């Protein structure tokens, strides 16, 4: 694994194996981005910062997006580092809970990447991985994203938007609702 359970002895081999496997998709124009999703337990500490830098270097031939689930990573130094490397900072929509990333529409690369995880605050820390992401966005919640998406789209050459999907399948309905709002705003 490259982001969740990293083995210091094998991560580089894992990254090279991943790169070899994904290269044909990139060469065929079928790979929009590689998302590196780091869990809440990935802290802004020297060892983790060093690892992130090495991993981004190993995968630098790919269009990269980095998703941090820990607010510690949302400082000016990290943002500038991502811009210098032309790596997208994944904007995440999550519950507004202590320690989680802030709502952000920062664009750090030609690619902008947004993930909607839902705002199920009651199950975020106590639920399992399925119930944590069960969430049906209201039209108002999604509508508030339209100006953000417009601004991101104006700054980036490509905007990717994803919804986290689990047992109830809310992602498809949420995506359709956002698509309707985006079309009404002439964004899509």
Model-derived segments and spans:
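Residues lining hydrophobic/aromatic ligand-binding pockets adjacent to catalytic sites
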Residues: 1-188
């Amino acid at each position: 694994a490259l982001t969740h359970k990293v083995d210091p002895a094998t991560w580089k081999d894992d990254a090279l194996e991943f790169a070899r496997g994904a290269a044909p998709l990139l060469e065929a124009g079928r790979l929009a981005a590689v998302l590196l999703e780091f869990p809440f337990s990935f802290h802004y500490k020297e060892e983790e910062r060093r690892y992130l830098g090495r991993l981004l270097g190993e995968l630098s031939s790919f269009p990269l997006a980095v998703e941090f689930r820990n607010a510690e990573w949302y400082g000016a130094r990290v943002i500038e580092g991502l811009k210098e490397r032309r790596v997208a900072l994944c904007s995440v929509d999550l519950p507004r809970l202590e320690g989680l990333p802030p709502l952000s529409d920062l664009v750090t690369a030609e690619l902008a990447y947004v993930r909607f995880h839902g705002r199920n605050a009651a199950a975020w820390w106590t639920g399992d991985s399925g119930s944590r992401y069960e969430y049906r966005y209201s039209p108002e919640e999604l509508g508030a994203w339209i100006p953000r998406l417009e601004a991101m789209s104006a700054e980036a050459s490509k905007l990717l938007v994803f919804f986290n999907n689990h047992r109830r399948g809310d992602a498809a309905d949420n995506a359709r609702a956002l698509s309707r709002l985006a079309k009404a705003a002439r964004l899509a």
